[in-house]
From Swiss-Prot:
This is ATP synthase subunit c. It is found in: Cell inner membrane. It holds the Pfam family ATP-synt_C. The keyword Transmembrane applies. The keyword Transport applies. The gene is atpE. Keywords: ATP synthesis, Cell inner membrane, Cell membrane, CF(0), Hydrogen ion transport, Ion transport, Lipid-binding, Membrane, Transmembrane, Transmembrane helix, Transport. The record marks 60 as: Reversibly protonated during proton transport. Belongs to the ATPase C chain family. It comes from Polaromonas sp. (strain JS666 / ATCC BAA-500). GO terms for molecular function: lipid binding; proton-transporting ATP synthase activity, rotational mechanism. GO terms for cellular component: plasma membrane; proton-transporting ATP synthase complex; proton-transporting two-sector ATPase complex, proton-transporting domain. HAMAP family: ATP_synth_c_bact. Its main location: membrane.
Amino acid sequence: MEHVLGFVALAAGLIIGLGAVGACIGIGIMGSKYLEAAARQPELMNELQTKMFLLAGLIDAAFLIGVGIAMMFAFANPFVLK
């Protein structure tokens, strides 16, 4: 029983940590590509900015869904029988 709780805590930490790292890397790469594209074609900057913020929100939403799942495993653990 204690092993299950320990592994669930480890899994929740990994879900949150790796999700945060992935989201940060994704947003960083996307931001650098946006700056490259805006420097190449400044007239498209407003259209690109809208798309960039939309994608940044989607990337963050995927991370927050992972946080929600990790919190469900941590506090309402479906693997422990009561």
